[in-house]
Curated annotation (Swiss-Prot):
DNA-dependent RNA polymerase catalyzes the transcription of DNA into RNA using the four ribonucleoside triphosphates as substrates. This is DNA-directed RNA polymerase subunit alpha. It comes from Crucihimalaya wallichii. It is found in: Plastid, Chloroplast. GO terms for biological process: DNA-templated transcription. One of its GO terms (cellular component) is chloroplast. Disulfide bonds: none annotated. It is an enzyme of class 2 (transferase). SUPFAM superfamilies: C-terminal domain of RNA polymerase alpha subunit (SSF47789), Insert subdomain of RNA polymerase alpha subunit (SSF56553), RBP11-like subunits of RNA polymerase (SSF55257).
Length: 327
């Protein structure tokens, strides 16, 4: 563990790591300070950083398992101590480190009896395991077990949607969140109008990256969000008597749904749930948080309603329609 005394600069804004430790292979802790800040700035930065650390960071997870040995995900396999559900839960706990984009395949192919750990996973070159000792299963008899794994990099979380059971493929709830927790606190000093603040930021990670790396990545993500404002043309717009008010062009949302209804009259949209569509995790989570559970719910929302959904974009509607038209 590394711990340093806090020295406050009275002039230049500076940040510093004042405590760093590794509690285990899958738990890192870091404590940072930023000072000096004017009154109110510490809370503004602290809230933004915490949200960026917990919601904007990308992680790598096992998202799907495929094996001819598994009849269904709540079954038991002769010669294996754990149930299939327990094996899937153990695979869900595996912590991976990578910078991959898209998806990759991995493989477990072992012969019993013996213990299967994360060390037995055959990974692509771009992926590595944080803790090789993580337990997966126990083979009690001399059987062969081969399991195919799908690895993805994303952010947030992805709820499993069981729709490919015919090919013995089983999804896993994936949590793409390398930062397990983040807190901020504020210390004020000085008197009167000269009062200043120190921001303390605590970060816990799962070992796939260090707290310092997480802080840098979250900072870059926040900077990228604000960059477009730096390029806004310096023009002043005056809206007098609504003369220059611009109406958003009608997005052909309902038109495309109407065409879908004509082609697929047998579909009852109120019975088609968004869980069935294999939507990207961000789109799925946005809709769920807005109580949109079926296609009918989606259709009953106006363009203005959809745009008001946090983190939801017009392009996301197009993605949903593209998926529907392929069904």
């Amino acid at each position: 563990m590394v711990r340093e005394k806090v020295k406050v600069s009275t002039r230049t804004l500076q940040w510093k790591c004042v405590e760093s430790r590794r509690d285990s292979k899958r738990l890192y802790y870091g404590r940072f300070i930023l000072s000096p800040l004017m009154k109110g700035q510490a809370d503004t930065i602290g809230i933004a950083m915490r949200r960026a650390l917990l919601g904007e960071m990308e992680g790598t997870c096992i998202t799907r398992v495929k094996s001819e040995n598994i009849p269904h995900d709540y079954s038991n396999i002769v010669g294996i101590q754990e149930s299939v559900h327990e094996i899937l839960m153990n695979l869900n706990e595996i912590v991976l480190r990578s910078n991959l984009y898209g998806t990759r395949n991995a493989l477990i192919c072992v012969q019993g009896p013996g213990y299967i750990t994360a060390r037995d996973i055959i990974l692509p070159p771009s992926v590595e395991i944080v803790d090789n000792t993580q337990h997966i299963a126990t083979l009690t008899e001399p059987i062969d077990l081969c399991i195919g794994l799908k690895i993805e990099r994303n952010r947030g979380y992805s709820l499993k949607i069981s729709n490919n059971l015919e090919d013995r493929s089983y999804p896993i709830d994936a949590v793409f969140m390398p930062v397990q927790n983040a807190n901020h606190s504020i210390h004020s000093y000085g008197n009167g109008n000269e009062k200043q603040e120190i921001l303390f930021l605590e970060i816990w990670t799962n070992g796939s990256l260090t707290p310092k790396e997480a802080l840098h990545e979250a900072s870059r993500n926040l900077i990228n969000l604000f960059i477009p404002f730096l390029h806004v043309e310096e023009e002043t717009f005056y809206l007098e008597n609504n003369q220059h008010q611009v109406t958003l062009p009608f997005f052909p949302f309902h038109n495309r749904f109407f065409n879908l209804r004509k082609k697929k009259k047998e579909l009852a949209f109120q019975y088609i749930f968004i869980d069935q569509l294999e939507l990207p995790p961000r789109i799925y989570n946005c809709l769920k948080k807005s109580n949109i559970h079926t296609l009918l719910d989606l259709l009953n929302n106006s363009q203005e309603d959809l745009i008001k959904i946090e983190h939801f974009h017009v392009e996301d509607v197009k993605k949903i329609l593209d998926i529907l038209e392929k069904k």
